[in-house]
Amino acid sequence: MPKVLRIINRLNLGGPTYNAAYLSKYISDDFETLLVAGMKDESEASSAYIVDNLGLKPRYIKNMYREINPIKDFRAYKELVQIIKEFQPDIVHTHAAKAGAIGRLAAYNCGVPIILHTFHGHVFHSYFGQLKTRIFLEIERFLARKSTKIVAISNIQKQELCEQFKVAPCEKFEVVPLGFDLERFQINHPERRRAFRAKYGLNQEDLVIGIIGRLVPIKNHHLLIQAFAEVQAKTQKTLKLIIIGDGELREELERFSHSLKLKISNRTAVKSDVVFTSWITDIESALPGLDIVALSSFNEGTPVSLIEAQAANIPIISTRVGGIEDIVLEGETAVLSENNNLEEFSTKLLDLVEDDSLRRRFTIKGFEHVYERYSYTNLCSNMSTLYTSLNQERTIKAKN
């Protein structure tokens, strides 16, 4: 039975954890899998409950963190080398940047025959300055040469990585979309809506816009907050903005909201315009309480929040970046705005707020669209097929 060593940066809320967890739990019994994870930052919400609920028992690399630290990174490398020597995997599959760097080097130097890496996003624009971005790009090109295959999670991401950024030749890439348990978003909508709105002091007639994600620069919450303030001044409807998540920019975003004369709260919307809820782990219970899900990022891979919003049949407004056009049905489940264009974003948000029939139309196709493409059963089937194919190619080469 082929052995798969799966290495993930850290167990924080987001697509990579779900991807690694579902693959580790549900991939074909033809493979034996060991899940290894680094450590999350203190400011991040843990997603360890996801692997715990699936009955997984990952091994933790205590020195592997998101931030670059040569001493800790070298120690993490040595820990991974030891695990590889003990487990003797046929396949090492890494997820996200830090795990991809340390894990692929360790696997290559230990002679692991099949090495894969999944890009859950990339940092080749909108994250760093030109020099730092160039360094990271050259590192990824070097690591790609050590890899058997590179997995992209959308066709747009593949095009960016192989054609625009030339990380590796296009034939080295395979597209395997993310996978989730999406049926849980279809349960008890009316009850969940009432409970969420009662918890946060929202009236049933309030029109509630929500955004879900880390409060970090790349997510560009400033754009949404400013657009919300502009739309609020133009509509007769009672608007509320729910910001779900946490991170380094929380205090700055609160100050920015104040500067726009918006009233904020961490608990209730009774006398507030904007509520910062921090993280909500049972997001399937929160989404029915929203009327619109927004995303305002400068850059994205395959944002989980938009997949989940469609699974819950919630209309979307988003910037047109990264793999988002692959995820939504523009004009049927979502409206898209050009990157960081406040005028366009505000105009389209106002249209979505004012047009009740448009929002109703956007609730029809969401679940069907994402279930066909992003169920965890499809993810596991597609990845199992890829593993089997690569293992068969390896066996044939060994015989020759």
Predicted regions and their residues:
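Short hydrophobic beta-strand element within catalytic cores of glycosyltransferases
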Residues: 315-318, 328
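Conserved acidic donor-binding segment of nucleotide-sugar-dependent glycosyltransferases
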Residues: 330-331, 335-342, 351-357
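Aromatic "clamp/platform" in nucleotide-sugar-dependent glycosyltransferases that forms part
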Residues: 279, 298
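A conserved mid-protein helix/loop that constitutes part of the nucleotide-sugar donor-binding site
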Residues: 17-22, 207, 211-232, 241, ...
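N-terminal strand-loop element at the rim of the active site
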Residues: 6-14, 18-72, 160, 164, ...
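A short, active-site helix/loop in glycosyltransferases that binds the activated sugar's phosphate group
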Residues: 146-172, 180-184
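Nucleotide-activated donor-binding/catalytic signature segment of Leloir-type glycosyltransferases, i.e.
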Residues: 254-278
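A short, well-ordered alpha-helix in the C-terminal region of glycosyltransferases
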Residues: 198, 344, 351, 358-372, ...
